[in-house]
């Protein structure tokens, strides 16, 4: 285990850090010596710090996520990241351990591919300009997000923190990559999980109801709220607290029925809610929002978890038909990135939990 970093200054004045790191393969640890420079902080959070750096041998930009390690537990994020290999998921290249300033402090450092933008910043850019994000981008970003979810769900992993800040974007190619697996977990049927996960605006209602036996469909709900945010230019359910979050959802979906509450959390006993009617979906969004977009969101943002489509099924929805056109182009004129469907379903196959999700009825 590497705990020592060696820093030195070159004649050029660059501060170079050399380290022995493990190659991020799912198998036997292979150690290599790497060095990087031009390190600067690009993100902070409760998890730790993210640095931007350049690998000395290739000048390739990388992101280094530094996380304080609890020695009592294996790091779940590292275990999961080593398993993942998908074009719409950020790639873990290397990892190493380093000592902290305090005695016995140990940090895990994940060296990840660097992707310059996020859906959050792209959406905020258009919002500040008082412009709507081009619909081709909504389709492109959502399709790739759903692809990444289809992949991780097929191997039993739930991300549990889908939000615009965790969706990285290459603005030139239009490629989206899902990042931050710090909350991710292998979900095992009938094994309890904590309900207090996922950022508030994007939390599925079963989590707000305190469910501990939830499924991968919490990620699908979160994806639906991201799509709604791209169409609206602001979060669809901007709650100030857990209870307020539920109020925001009820304002749109109406009061959940007793059966819907049971489907979200069978142990929930309080049924005292004001009776509010559902708001028509076409009145939630702008006048010229495509009917296919509204139809897809109405199927995803649904109280009953088993009624939400799987990511594979959602990818087959008519909203994404433009992406299947070989002549489709980005606003820049560039061709779309490769968008074949991955995972066990294969191209063109559909699996739904609640019947057809092909598109709005005529």
Curated annotation (Swiss-Prot):
- Active-site residues, as the UniProt record annotates them: 161
GO BP: any one term: regulation of microtubule cytoskeleton organization
Q: Which GO terms describe its molecular function?
A: ATP binding; protein serine/threonine kinase activity
Tell me the SMART domains matching this sequence. Answer: S_TKc
Key words, A-Z: ATP-binding, Developmental protein, Kinase, Nucleotide-binding, Serine/threonine-protein kinase, Stress response, Transferase, Wnt signaling pathway
Task: Cite the Protein kinase domain residue spans from the record.
Answer: 36-320
Superkingdom, natural source? Eukaryota
Which reaction is the catalytic activity of this chain? L-seryl-[tau protein] + ATP = O-phospho-L-seryl-[tau protein] + ADP + H(+); L-threonyl-[tau protein] + ATP = O-phospho-L-threonyl-[tau protein] + ADP + H(+)
Task: Report the EC number(s), separated by commas if there are several.
Answer: 2.7.11.26
Q: Give the CDD domains listed for this entry.
A: STKc_GSK3
Q: Cite the residue spans of the region called Disordered.
A: 325-362
Give the record's GO CC terms. cytoplasm; cytosol; nucleus
| Job of this protein | Phosphorylates oma-1, a regulator of the oocyte-to-embryo transition, enabling its degradation. Phosphorylates skn-1, preventing it from accumulating in nuclei and thus inhibiting phase II gene expression in the oxidative stress defense. Involved in mesendoderm specification and mitotic spindle orientation in EMS blastomeres. Thought to be a branch point in these processes as proteins downstream are not required. Negatively regulates Wnt signaling in vulval precursor cells and acts as a Wnt-independent repressor of med-1 and med-2 in the C lineage inhibiting mesoderm development.
Assembly and interaction partners = Monomer. Interacts with axl-1.
Q: What is this protein called?
A: Glycogen synthase kinase-3
Q: Which organism encodes this protein?
A: Caenorhabditis elegans
């Amino acid at each position: 285990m590497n705990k020592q970093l060696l820093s030195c200054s070159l004649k050029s004045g660059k501060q170079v850090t050399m380290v022995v790191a493990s190659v991020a393969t799912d198998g036997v640890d292979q150690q290599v010596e790497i060095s990087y420079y031009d390190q600067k902080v690009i993100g902070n959070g409760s998890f730790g710090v993210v640095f931007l750096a350049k690998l000395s041998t290739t000048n390739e930009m990388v992101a280094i996520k530094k996380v304080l390690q609890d020695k009592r537990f294996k790091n779940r994020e590292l275990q999961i990241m080593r398993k993942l290999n998908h074009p719409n998921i950020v790639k873990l290249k290397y990892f190493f351990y380093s000592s902290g300033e305090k005695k016995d402090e140990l940090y895990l450092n994940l060296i990840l591919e660097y992707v310059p933008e996020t859906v959050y910043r792209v959406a905020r850019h258009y919002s500040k300009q008082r412009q709507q994000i081009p619909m081709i981008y909504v389709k492109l970003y959502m399709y790739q997000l759903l692809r990444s979810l289809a992949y991780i769900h097929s191997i039993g992993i739930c991300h549990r923190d889908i939000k615009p800040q965790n969706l990285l974007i290459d603005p030139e190619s239009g490629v989206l990559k899902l990042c931050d697996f710090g909350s991710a977990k292998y979900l095992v049927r009938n094994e309890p999980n904590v309900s207090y996960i996922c950022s508030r605006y994007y939390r599925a209602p079963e989590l707000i109801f305190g469910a501990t036996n939830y499924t991968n469909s919490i990620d699908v709900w979160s994806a639906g709220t991201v799509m709604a945010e791209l169409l609206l230019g602001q979060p669809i359910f901007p709650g100030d607290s857990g209870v307020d979050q539920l109020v925001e959802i009820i304002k749109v979906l109406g009061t959940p029925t007793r059966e819907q509450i049971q489907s979200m959390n069978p142990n929930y006993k309080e049924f005292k809610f004001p009776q509010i009617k559902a708001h028509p979906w076409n009145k939630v969004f702008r006048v010229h929002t495509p009917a296919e977009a509204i139809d897809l969101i109405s199927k995803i943002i649904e109280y009953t978890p088993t009624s939400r489509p799987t990511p594979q099924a959602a990818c087959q929805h008519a909203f994404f038909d433009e992406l299947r056109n070989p002549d489709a182009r980005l606003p820049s004129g560039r061709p779309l990135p490769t968008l074949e469907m991955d995972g066990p379903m294969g191209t063109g196959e559909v699996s739904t939990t609640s019947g057809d999700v092909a598109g709005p009825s005529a």
